[in-house]
Amino acid sequence: MDKRQICIKFAREVSAILKIAAPAIRFVPVKQLRTSTQIVALTPDGILIRNDIGVTPELFFAIAHELRHAYQLENDRSLHDYRTSDQLDIDEYNAQPLEVDANAFAAVVMAEFFGISPQFLNMPESIRQLICVRKRQIQKEL
């Protein structure tokens, strides 16, 4: 399987867990994403994936994270107070409930699919704890 097929298959499997329709997947140049460090983005037209990134755990984590955002949108999670990464500093951004939830869900997926447990070492302990608590809640729900 090539990268496109692998990503589509993974997105379908994760979407089935979330009980959402698998969004379209497009590979795009990095300039079409919000930042140069972004790997994957959820748009109204589907998921955009950087075309210059290889098949890595980070790619799968990012796809699962964005699919959780798609789930949040479909299930009317409040976006009223949500701010994008260019509107807040990185710690404030990651502490938002929707980001905590998406990170926790992606961590559960990584553990279930690949036996990998993301540590979030680039985040403060307070945010890691929020993710850990939410991760345990999600594990009970699945």
Regions found by a protein language model. Name each.
Residues 26-30:
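Subset of outer-membrane beta-barrel
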Residues 57-58, 73-100, 104:
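Post-HEXXH active-site segment of zinc metalloproteases
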Residues 2-22:
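Zn2+-dependent metallopeptidase catalytic core
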